């Protein structure tokens, strides 16, 4: 059995967290599973590299910017491989180009076109854990490209599909996926399972947990994801294509600036109820619309968090 483990920047922010990520990998290996790790740049590293580039030039070239930005993930991969070796697990760090990740030529927003993964397969065959630099690949000219925001998630999903992995675990600093951002709505509920289509709509609406391109890839390739905490506690949230009998009527709420979007198979007819909920609490609704399986309202930014909390209490109360 093969598992893809993807670790975000906040899960690799310091030496202690690097070792914790390595421990999670070793634990899977002790259960008899092969593992491919995919890593983001350490927390803050990408912003530091970007600031450095713009301190040198007000308009750095796209090619060189990609070459620079990709080094953050490469550093993380090397450090994770070192941490694994320190725990007795053989490992090898691989940049995107070494992993056989071929993209188009759109620097900064490249899309994966083919994935050969020859060196990854070879490492796995020899009991070695490949630690792959996420967020990057190589184009037909041999130039390094980056995949844009959320690119490491996309790398993990693409590898899961190409290698036919049994699982793709996305480790973050939260316990899983909630009915709303728990930082804004403390009463938000952790979901055991979520539908890939619903998560994609929430991502389009501004939810920050999983990026849209990775979810599009998961939907296209039939990859199941599990979003879980990097502290290793709990089972997190399984994201897959749910049957109609399994799908909840409402999946969650997303906030982007002053727009609050409700997503779910019954959300498309909820606009009037959303407006009424806000009106009952004295919150002015500035606009809104309904879609097939979503509806949104617009409020003043100063009212946004209070409106989000009110809508969550209305639609996701325990009695509902």
For each feature predicted by the language model, list its residue ranges.
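Nucleotide/pyrophosphate-binding catalytic subdomain
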Residues: 1-215, 288-291, 295-303
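A conserved regulatory-domain signal marking ACT and ACT-like small-molecule sensing domains
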Residues: 236-320
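A conserved active-site cap/scaffold subdomain adjacent to cofactor or substrate pockets
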Residues: 202-240
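Glycine-rich beta-alpha junction loops
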Residues: 42, 174-176, 221, 229-234, ...
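Conserved NTP-handling cores and scaffolds of large molecular machines
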Residues: 163, 206, 222, 282, ...
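A broad, low-specificity signal marking well-ordered, structured residues that form hydrophobic/aromatic
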Residues: 130, 145, 225, 237, ...
